[in-house]
């Protein structure tokens, strides 16, 4: 079985008290528009998503293109789903240095139960692997923490958060009939390279130099 782990596109920010479930930003919507073509070569048989809006909205263009429903599995939600706000990870460094230090060290935010997060994500994947045909390709629209956890479990990295997982990126996992997992690719972003925040800054700087 092949699993395509797609991180959600760029969301809006939510402030304290607004919850951690924002919609996609305009930039994020532009990123999602490129996913149907980027995934066109894969014979996707099911589309699964986290219950969070940013993941569902990222999944919808692919589901529409394939004429498949978006199946929701709560267990693919991000570790932040019960937090009071959503701050894009690239903004945490300046606004909350203590939590940023935890992330750099490979830990989840202090308010998150890492063991519970790990247990629910691994259970979701185990159930998925057990429920589909070995020849199936399933697209799972989820989050950077979920994708990092799965890579950590498969590759045995020292830290849970070890990988750069960009918005609308694709990470490809292969599962044998016995459930053995292999990593085929990580953080494929060619389809949205020019739409990622850090790359847009590089492009802007380059344009300024040429101007």
Regions found by a protein language model. Give the residues of each.
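Short active-site segment of divalent metal-dependent hydrolases/proteases
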Residues: 11, 146-147
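Active-site-proximal alpha-helix that buttresses catalytic centers in soluble enzyme cores
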Residues: 2-72
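Generic structural signal for well-ordered alpha-helical scaffold segments
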Residues: 33-40, 118, 122-130, 151
């Amino acid at each position: 079985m092949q699993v395509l782990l797609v991180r959600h596109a760029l969301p809006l920010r939510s402030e304290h008290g607004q919850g951690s479930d924002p919609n996609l930003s305009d930039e994020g919507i532009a990123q999602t528009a490129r996913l149907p073509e980027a995934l066109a070569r894969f014979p996707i048989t099911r589309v699964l998503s986290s219950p969070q809006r940013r993941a569902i909205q990222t999944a919808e263009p692919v589901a529409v293109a394939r004429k498949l429903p978006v199946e929701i599995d709560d267990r693919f939600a991000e570790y932040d789903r019960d937090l009071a706000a959503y701050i894009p990870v690239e903004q945490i460094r300046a606004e909350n240095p203590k939590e940023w230090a935890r992330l750099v060290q490979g830990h989840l935010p202090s308010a998150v139960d890492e063991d519970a997060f790990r247990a629910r994500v691994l259970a979701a994947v185990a159930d998925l692997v057990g429920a589909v045909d070995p020849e199936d390709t399933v697209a799972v629209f989820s989050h950077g923490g979920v994708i990092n956890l799965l890579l950590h479990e498969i590759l045995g990295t020292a830290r849970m958060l070890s990988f750069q997982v960009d918005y609308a990126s694709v990470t490809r996992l292969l599962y044998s009939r016995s459930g053995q997992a292999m990593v085929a690719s990580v953080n494929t972003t060619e389809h949205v390279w020019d739409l990622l925040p850090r790359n847009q800054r590089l492009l802007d700087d380059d344009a300024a130099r040429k101007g």
